[in-house]
Design a protein with these regions (language model features):
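Compact, glycine-rich, soluble single-domain proteins
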Residues: 2-79
Length: 79
């Protein structure tokens, strides 16, 4: 499983293990899966959709940055 951390300036939005995450990148949406290669990307207005073992959730964002490293996806967002 991929570890996901979504952080806003005022709070931790989500932290947990997920199967996949789809992000609104500035050059198009992209999906991060378990054992993804390291990457840093800016995000634009849209939805972050993440799939857990028991279902799917989404978070609307205005902008942000995402980094994948060592099977951890850290996302800093403006909500």
């Amino acid at each position: 499983m991929l570890k996901l951390r979504i952080i806003a300036p005022d709070r931790l939005v989500f932290e947990g293990d997920v199967e996949s995450v789809t992000l609104p990148g500035t050059v198009g949406s992209f999906t991060v899966l378990n054992r993804h290669a390291p990457i840093i990307s800016s995000l634009e207005k849209g939805k972050i959709v993440y799939k857990e073992a028991n279902g799917q959730s989404e978070v609307a964002v205005r902008s942000g940055f995402a980094e994948v490293r060592d099977n951890v996806l850290s996302i800093c967002v403006e909500l």
